[in-house]
A protein has these predicted regions:
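Catalytic-core "active-site belt" of small-molecule-metabolizing enzymes
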Residues: 2-201, 236-242, 250-258
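A conserved acidic, glycine/proline-rich C-terminal tail/linker
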Residues: 205-234
Length: 258
């Protein structure tokens, strides 16, 4: 471990402890590339008092986001095991610096995930999946200004991982045609939003992430949960919000914010 990795991870850790707003890393604090950023992230996760890993998440998953930020790949972060909840879940807003939500598919990993010799692709990825579930991701962006966001700084800060709420697994998911599954957002009494669940390219993103995690020798084991990008735009939550994510007639996940 280099002194820079220790220095930057400690800086971010202290920022979390003191409740400071997120800001881009600058000058000698900014990582050279994603490899260095993820080493900083690993060290930060070791410092944070949030327990062992329970999985991983993706940020900046769409091509539009990547083009805007001048990158060619998503950004990933770790999900902490004790921050993976089951629906219905009451979320206490004051426990977060600034909490937003995203609407995702969640994948529970199978025993095959430990095999690092396989290059994952959409034709073979099903063997790495034991369950598929609707999910609501909790994003804690620490009050960040999204204009001018530096993806390397986001990677260092664990991609703003704030937790996850899961619905029940989809029954016989391997037999489903996901082209026919709609993802619906219900937010209080507002008009519903609906789109195809595959719009966020969940299976393609899952392949990319598993390959990336193995290449960087990250921890991967059966039972971990991976989420791979939101089908709707991220939105800030407020006290009193009641939010549902419904997958056609294949299940739902709900939170209430207090």
């Amino acid at each position: 471990m280099t002194s820079k990795i220790e220095k930057v991870s400690e800086f971010i850790f202290q920022s979390h402890k003191s409740g400071d707003a997120f800001s881009n890393l600058e000058k000698d604090m900014k990582p050279q590339d994603f490899d260095e950023a993820y080493e900083i992230q690993k060290r930060l996760r070791q410092k944070l008092p949030r327990g062992p890993l329970g999985g991983y998440k993706i940020a900046l998953s769409s091509k539009i986001q990547q083009d805007y930020h001048k990158i060619t790949q998503p950004v990933y972060g770790g999900l902490f095991k004790k921050e993976i909840f089951h629906s219905p879940k009451t979320i206490v807003l004051k426990d977060y610096h600034r909490m937003s939500v995203e609407f995702e598919l969640a994948f529970e990993l199978s025993d095959r995930i430990t095999d690092s010799t396989i290059n994952r692709n959409p034709k073979n990825i099903f063997s790495d999946i034991s369950n598929v579930m609707p999910a609501i991701e909790l994003v804690d962006d620490r009050g960040a200004n999204y204009e001018g966001l530096d993806p390397l700084s986001l990677a260092c800060d664990n991609a703003w991982s704030g937790g996850l709420v899961l619905g029940d697994p989809i029954c016989d998911w391997k037999e489903k045609d996901f082209l026919n599954i709609q993802s619906t957002c219900e937010w209080n009494q507002e008009p519903k939003l609906t789109t195809n669940v595959l719009d966020a390219k969940p299976f393609e993103n899952l392949c990319w992430l598993i390959n990336e995690l193995h290449s960087c020798q990250n921890e991967l084991k059966a039972g971990m949960i991976i989420i791979t990008g939101s089908v709707f735009k991220v939105r800030q939550a407020k006290t009193g919000d009641k939010i549902n994510h419904i997958l056609s007639d294949h299940g739902n996940v709900s939170i209430e914010v207090i």
